Regions:
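Gly/Gly-Pro-rich "capping" loops immediately C-terminal to redox-active cysteine motifs
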Residues: 18-70, 148-188
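Amphipathic alpha-helical interaction surfaces
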Residues: 34-40, 77, 100, 104, ...
Length: 206
């Protein structure tokens, strides 16, 4: 039971990053907006899938990054903020949580359910008019007509998809494949009508 306490505390950093990593977040997003079910859910960029893949070379930085450096990049780009220093409470919390979920997984392996599913190229070229209609019919209910999400009692309950309170140029979501794969996993229920965020999906718990 005692071993779970650090992981539970770290869970709060993933779910409410702006509060528990204050000073390093420059927008309204939390880690769990992209890493669903607080980083647990398979095929939704789970943290347990990423942890065992590092150290790894990243073209964005032009060097081999360790997991700490990868998390720092998330704060700089996806959170549009600043990188917490190595050994800071925020990074140690995220590293502890990721390690706890990935414990026992083979290091260096591409685990089933890591990352996002591959999305095939669309049969038609991108079209703003079609996209506007799809957004109005499928996305605006949660994210708003302007894509800026929704806040309740001062807390962001649905994330902004673009703009000053969202990610910047360096985030993975600037590539069309990442938000498409994420939205398919995040926003759609399965055939049984079960929300994907209700399913277990960690290396330890799946």
């Amino acid at each position: 039971m005692g071993a779970l306490l650090p992981a539970r505390a770290s869970h709060r950093t993933v779910s409410d990053t702006g509060t528990h990593a204050a000073g390093f977040v420059g927008n309204s997003l939390s880690c769990s907006n992209c890493h669903l079910d607080a980083g647990r859910l398979a095929n939704s960029a789970p943290l347990w899938g990423a942890y065992v893949r590092y150290p790894a070379y990243r073209a964005k930085t032009g060097k081999v990054n360790n997991y700490t450096e990868r998390l720092q990049g998330c704060f700089m780009y996806s959170m549009d903020g600043t990188a917490p220093p190595a050994g800071s409470e925020a990074l140690v919390a995220l590293e502890t949580y990721s390690y706890w979920m990935a414990e026992g997984a083979p290091v260096g392996a591409q685990l089933p359910g890591a990352g996002y599913p591959e999305i095939p190229a669309p049969p038609l070229p991108p079209d703003f008019a079609r996209g506007e209609a799809v957004f109005a019919d499928n996305c605006a209910l949660c994210h708003g007509d302007d894509g800026q999400g929704q806040r309740v009692a001062g807390r962001q309950v649905f994330p902004p998809l673009w703009g000053p309170q969202s990610y910047n140029w360096g985030a993975a979501c600037t590539s069309w494949t990442t938000p498409l794969a994420s939205s398919r996993r995040t926003c759609h229920s399965d055939a049984a009508g079960v929300s994907p965020t209700s399913r277990p999906g960690t290396w330890r718990c799946s």
